[in-house]
Amino acid sequence: MDNMNHEELNDQLLVRREKLHNLREQGIDPFGKRFERTNSTTDLVSLYGEFSKEELEEKEITVSIAGRIMTKRGKGKAGFAHIQDLQGQVQIYVRKDTVGDEEYELFTTADLGDLVGIEGKVFKTNVGELSVKAIGFTLLTKSLRPLPDKYHGLKDVEQRYRQRYLDLITSMESRETFVTRSKIIREMRRYLDDNGYLEVETPMMHAIAGGASARPFTTHHNALDMELYMRIAIELHLKRLIVGGLEKVYEIGRVFRNEGVSTRHNPEFTMIELYEAYADYNDIMKLTENMVAHIAKKVLGTTTIQYGDYEINLEPEWTRLHMVDAIKQHSGADFWNPMSVEEARELAKEHNVEIKNTMEVGHIINEFFEQKVEDKLIQPTFIYGHPVEISPLAKKNDEDPRFTDRFELFIVAREHANAFTELNDPIDQKERFEAQLKEREQGNDEAHMMDDDYIEALEYGMPPTGGLGIGIDRLVMLLTNAPSIRDVLLFPAMRHKQD
C-alpha cells in the first residue's frame, strides 16, 4: 500500500472513530442489542416478489429485516441503501418525515459496512425493484473499518484466504460455496444414517501415527510425559470398533499431515472414514458411487456437473479398471507377468519413469501409474488392484497375491477416495508392519509404524470388512467447481504474513 492510500485509510479510520464517539455522546450504543427479524432478504423476494406495485401498496405488509449496508445514496430528506444478509441484498428507502429526525440522522451518518435493523413496509419502486420503506431505523453495529471497494472486491487472492470474513462479506459466490459445503456433509451423514451406519468419535491424538503413509505432527502431553501424534488417519480406531461388534461405523473429522501445501493439499483437512463388517471392496465401490450421486442430486439437483473445462457425469455405474491394465493402456508397459526388481527398474528406464533405488516392484508399478496414468482419469474411475508393497492395511487378492483388494477413486485426475477389503489376518498384518519398519530404516519416513495394540485387537477376530476414506475438501472442490482447496476451507493454512 502506497503512502497516499495508507493516509486515506487512516483518515477513514479516524472519521469512523469520531462517529463512534459522537454516538456515545448522544447516548446511542454503537454496538447495539438484539434485533428481532421477521424475514430474510430471500424471504422477501420469494413471498412478495410476484406482487405488483399496487398490490403491495394495498396490503401494507410490515417486515423487520437486518443486515450490513453495502451501498448508500441520496441527499436531503430521503435516501436509499442496500443491506445484505446471508442470502442476498434488498433495497431500503428512508425518509426523514417517516422515521423522524434522530433516526434519519443515524441513517445519513451511517457508513458502508455498518449493521442496521429496519422495520418498514414492503413496496416496489417505479422501476419494479422490491424494497422496504423504513418506519424505523436502528444502528446495530458501527463498522470501524471501510469495506473493500464494492466494484472490485478482494482481488488479492491471498487476502481472501487471510481475511475470510471480508471475502464472505464481499463475495456471494464464496458464501454459497461454504453453505454448499455444509449441505454436502449433511447429506453424507443422512445417507449413511439411513443405511444403518453409526457415527462415532475417536481420538485425534495417537500414541502411534498409523492408518496412512504420511508425516505426522507431534505434540507432548505434559501430565503423562509422553509424545503424541496428531492423527494422520481415522482408520485403526474404527477397525477396533468393528472388532468390538459395531458392524457399520463412520466418522467425519479432522486429519493432520505434516506435508506440503498446494491447491490440493492442506496440512489440516476433513475426512470421512467408514467401515462395514461382512463387506468387501466391491460393496464399498457401490456404496461410494451411490452416495456421491445421492449427494450431488440432493445438493445440486443433478449428477452432471461442470469442473473447469470438463463436464463430469456422476451417475453410477462408474468405470472400474485394474491398475496394471490402466498402466498398459496408457503407457504400453505390462506388469502382469511377475518380474524381478531389476527388470522393473529397466522397464522404468525405458519409459522415462523416475524411481528411487530403494523401490521394490510394487512401488515401481505405483510410480508408473502416478506418472503415466493419473492425469488421464477425468470421468469417475475406480482404479483397483494396488500392489501389496504400498497397501499395508489391505487384504491380498486371492487370485494374485502381488496385488490387494483395494481401490482409489479418481475424478478430474485427482484421487477422491481410498478403500479396501481390510486385512483382518493378524499374522499377515504384523509381517506387513515389519516390512514397513524396514522401509523406515531405509529412509522412508512415511512408512507405517508398528502398532502392537492394533495387532492384539485383530487377534480377537475382526470379521471380513470393507473400508473407505473420502477427502471431504476435495469432494467439495469437485461439487462447487473450486480450483483450489483453499477456496473450500474457511481458514486455510498460510505462511506468516511478511511486514
Curated annotation (Swiss-Prot):
<dbReference type="InterPro" id="IPR004364">
    <property type="entry name" value="Aa-tRNA-synt_II"/>
</dbReference>
<keyword id="KW-0547">Nucleotide-binding</keyword>
<keyword id="KW-0436">Ligase</keyword>
<dbReference type="GO" id="GO:0000049">
    <property type="term" value="F:tRNA binding"/>
</dbReference>
<dbReference type="Pfam" id="PF00152">
    <property type="entry name" value="tRNA-synt_2"/>
</dbReference>
<feature type="binding site">
    <location>
        <position position="408"/>
    </location>
    <ligand>
        <name>Mg(2+) 1</name>
    </ligand>
</feature>
<dbReference type="GO" id="GO:0005829">
    <property type="term" value="C:cytosol"/>
</dbReference>
<dbReference type="GO" id="GO:0000287">
    <property type="term" value="F:magnesium ion binding"/>
</dbReference>
<dbReference type="GO" id="GO:0140096">
    <property type="term" value="F:catalytic activity, acting on a protein"/>
</dbReference>
<dbReference type="InterPro" id="IPR004365">
    <property type="entry name" value="NA-bd_OB_tRNA"/>
</dbReference>
<dbReference type="GO" id="GO:0004824">
    <property type="term" value="F:lysine-tRNA ligase activity"/>
</dbReference>
<dbReference type="Pfam" id="PF01336">
    <property type="entry name" value="tRNA_anti-codon"/>
</dbReference>
<dbReference type="InterPro" id="IPR045864">
    <property type="entry name" value="aa-tRNA-synth_II/BPL/LPL"/>
</dbReference>
<dbReference type="InterPro" id="IPR034762">
    <property type="entry name" value="Lys-tRNA-ligase_II_bac/euk"/>
</dbReference>
<dbReference type="InterPro" id="IPR012340">
    <property type="entry name" value="NA-bd_OB-fold"/>
</dbReference>
<dbReference type="InterPro" id="IPR018149">
    <property type="entry name" value="Lys-tRNA-synth_II_C"/>
</dbReference>
<keyword id="KW-0030">Aminoacyl-tRNA synthetase</keyword>
<dbReference type="GO" id="GO:0006430">
    <property type="term" value="P:lysyl-tRNA aminoacylation"/>
</dbReference>
<feature type="binding site">
    <location>
        <position position="415"/>
    </location>
    <ligand>
        <name>Mg(2+) 1</name>
    </ligand>
</feature>
<protein>
    <recommendedName>
        <fullName>Lysine--tRNA ligase</fullName>
        <ecNumber>6.1.1.6</ecNumber>
    </recommendedName>
</protein>
<comment type="subunit">
    <text>Homodimer.</text>
</comment>
<keyword id="KW-0648">Protein biosynthesis</keyword>
<keyword id="KW-0067">ATP-binding</keyword>
<comment type="similarity">
    <text>Belongs to the class-II aminoacyl-tRNA synthetase family.</text>
</comment>
<keyword id="KW-0963">Cytoplasm</keyword>
<feature type="binding site">
    <location>
        <position position="415"/>
    </location>
    <ligand>
        <name>Mg(2+) 2</name>
    </ligand>
</feature>
<keyword id="KW-0460">Magnesium</keyword>
<dbReference type="InterPro" id="IPR002313">
    <property type="entry name" value="Lys-tRNA-ligase_II"/>
</dbReference>
<dbReference type="InterPro" id="IPR006195">
    <property type="entry name" value="aa-tRNA-synth_II"/>
</dbReference>
<keyword id="KW-0479">Metal-binding</keyword>
<dbReference type="GO" id="GO:0016740">
    <property type="term" value="F:transferase activity"/>
</dbReference>
<dbReference type="GO" id="GO:0005524">
    <property type="term" value="F:ATP binding"/>
</dbReference>
<dbReference type="InterPro" id="IPR044136">
    <property type="entry name" value="Lys-tRNA-ligase_II_N"/>
</dbReference>
